[in-house]
Regions:
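Conserved catalytic-core element of eukaryotic-like protein kinases
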Residues: 2
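Activation segment of protein kinases
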Residues: 15-58
């Protein structure tokens, strides 16, 4: 499956801390097209869309991994990697612009995490992680370094209308790495 709309709004965290991906409305089976989702159609959310999606090219699991990279970038820095005045301007930046280093915003982020996120954000699918298991392995290798930066200032608020959850940044990154291994493998 290729989800094609991985974004913070489609990633839910249960009260128990389990990560769930939702909204499979524009999902496709890899190597399969329908009239609604054929090559040339642009589907997805501009802030989280892969370069190939923004160009209407075929998508793959690497496209979803790119989108996950945008989510991790925003989770760590507090902002998406690319912003424009319009959705089209934002989508164009995914094609043309290079993302800033995460350490520009957070000096305490381990180099291994920064490198993993930047690898996810490569413009060409062949330059990204080959599969979710490779990404998951790299993120789990960084678990000790992530836990070392766990401070009160690293708490991330996830708010729903009724319940407010607080998770540390390292816990969220590790949880996302686990969900990555289950969705795209």
């Amino acid at each position: 499956l290729v989800h094609r709309d991985i974004k913070p709004g489609n990633i839910m965290i249960t009260p128990e801390g389990k990560v769930k991906v939702t909204d499979f409305g524009i999902v496709s089976l890899q190597n399969e097209e329908s009239d609604i989702t054929k090559t040339g159609s642009i589907l997805g959310t501009a802030s989280y869309i892969s370069p190939e999606q923004a160009q209407g090219k075929p998508v793959s699991k690497e496209s979803d991994l790119y989108s996950l990279g945008t989510v991790l970038f925003e989770l760590i820095t507090g902002r998406p990697p690319f912003e424009g005045d319009t959705p089209i301007a934002t989508a164009t930046k995914h094609i043309t612009d290079k993302p800033e280093k995460l350490s520009t915003y957070r000096a305490d982020i381990p180099k291994g995490i920064e490198n993993a996120v930047l690898k996810l954000l490569h413009k060409y699918p062949k330059d990204r992680f080959k599969n979710a298991e490779d990404l998951r392995a790299v993120l789990l290798q960084q678990k000790t370094q992530l836990q070392a930066i766990q401070t009160q200032e690293n708490l991330v608020d996830l708010t729903s209308p009724k319940i407010k959850y607080r998770f540390t940044l390292p816990a969220l990154i590790i949880s996302l790495s686990i969900v990555v291994g289950t969705i795209w493998t």
